[in-house]
C-alpha cells in the first residue's frame, strides 16, 4: 500500500524501543504514513532510566535532514530530543533550508526515569528561537514548568503556562496533563484565539514510557494528512489512550 504521507522525525534513539525514534517510526507506520529519520543522539536506556547518551555530530544531523529531504520531501516534521546548543542551532539552520511548514516540537527535556536530556543553554535557544519556528509545541507539565519558569498544580496553571509560551512566540501549544493528580486526564490546547480542553478518563498503568513521543508523532501524521491542528491533537490523544490501554508488559520490573 502506498503511504498516505511522509514524516521526517528529528529525535534521539531509545535502545529499549519504547520511546524516541523507535516509538516515532512505529507510530507513523501504524497510522499509514512513511517515516524518515535524522538521529540526534543514541541513548542506552530501558523503562527504568537512561544509562548513557552518545551525541551525533551536528554536521551529520544536518546531512541527515537535508540529504533526506532533498530526495523525499516531508509533508510534516516531528522534532524530539535536541540535547545541545550545537544540535538546536543546526536543526534551526536545516529547517530554514528545507522550508517545511508543518512542524511539531516535543521539547524532550527529562526522561521518565528522571535523567536530564537537554542542557540549560539549549533550553534558552529553544525558547527564544525554535518555538517560534514550529506549528505546535507539546510539552508535558515538567517541561512546561521549565520553559515558563512557573509551577503547575492545576488546569488553570496549565492554561497560564500555555499563554506565556504563546506570548513568547509559540503559535499553538498543547500541554499534556498526565502529571496532575486526577482521575480525569486533561490536555490543554491553546493559541491566541482559543483555549480547548481535551478530557479523557486517566488509565491507571505504569505503561507510559514513550507516550509523549507517540503523541507528537501521531499529531504530525494526522496534520500531514490535512487535518486541522485541533483535530490532529484530538485524534492523536485518542490513539495514545488506546495504545496505553492495550500496551503489553514487557519489562521485568
Role assignments for model-derived ranges:
Residues 2-9, 23, 27-112:
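Conserved N-terminal subdomain of the carbohydrate kinase-like
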Residues 4, 55, 230-253:
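Charged C-terminal helix
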Residues 10-16, 195-209:
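Short pre-catalytic strand/loop immediately N-terminal to key active-site residues, enriched for Gly-Thr
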Residues 13, 79-80, 115, 208:
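Glycine- and other small-residue-rich loops at beta-strand/loop junctions that grip anionic moieties
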Residues 22-27, 146, 205-229:
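Short, small-residue alpha-helix embedded
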Residues 31-36, 195-196, 222-236:
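Phosphate-handling active-site elements
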Residues 49-56, 115-120, 149-153, 204:
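Short glycine-enriched, charge-decorated loop/helix-capping segments at active-site entrances
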Residues 120-194:
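Conserved phosphate/ATP/ADP-binding segment of small-molecule kinases
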Amino acid at each position: 500500500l502506498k503511504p498516505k504521507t511522509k514524516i521526517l522525525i528529528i529525535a534521539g534513539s531509545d535502545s529499549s524501543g519504547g520511546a524516541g525514534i523507535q516509538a516515532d517510526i512505529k507510530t507513523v507506520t501504524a497510522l499509514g504514513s512513511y517515516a524518515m529519520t535524522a538521529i540526534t543522539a543514541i541513548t542506552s536506556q530501558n523503562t527504568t532510566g537512561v544509562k548513557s547518551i552518545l551525541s551525533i555530530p551536528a554536521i551529520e544531523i544536518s546531512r541527515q535532514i537535508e540529504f533526506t529531504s532533498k530526495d523525499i520531501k516531508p509533508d510534516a516534521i516531528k522534532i524530539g530530543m535536541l540535547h545541545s546548543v550545537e544540535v538546536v542551532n543546526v536543526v534551526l539552520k536545516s529547517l530554514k533550508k528545507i522550508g517545511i511548514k508543518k512542524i511539531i516540537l516535543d521539547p524532550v527535556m527529562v526522561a521518565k526515569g528522571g535523567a536530564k536530556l537537554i542542557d540549560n543553554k539549549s533550553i534558552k535557544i529553544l525558547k527564544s528561537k525554535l518555538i517560534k519556528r514550529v506549528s505546535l509545541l507539546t510539552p508535558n507539565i515538567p517541561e512546561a514548568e521549565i520553559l515558563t519558569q512557573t509551577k503547575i498544580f492545576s488546569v488553570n496553571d496549565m492554561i497560564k503556562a500555555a499563554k506565556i509560551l504563546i506570548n513568547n512566540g509559540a503559535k499553538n501549544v498543547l500541554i499534556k496533563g498526565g502529571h496532575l493528580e486526577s482521575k480525569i486526564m486533561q490536555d490543554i490546547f491553546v493559541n491566541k484565539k482559543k483555549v480547548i480542553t481535551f478530557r479523557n478518563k486517566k488509565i491507571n498503568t505504569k505503561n507510559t514510557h514513550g507516550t509523549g513521543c507517540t503523541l507528537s508523532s501521531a499529531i504530525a501524521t494526522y496534520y500531514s494528512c490535512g487535518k486541522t491542528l485541533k483535530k490532529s491533537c484530538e485524534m492523536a490523544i485518542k490513539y495514545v489512550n488506546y495504545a496505553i490501554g492495550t500496551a503489553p508488559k514487557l519489562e521485568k520490573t
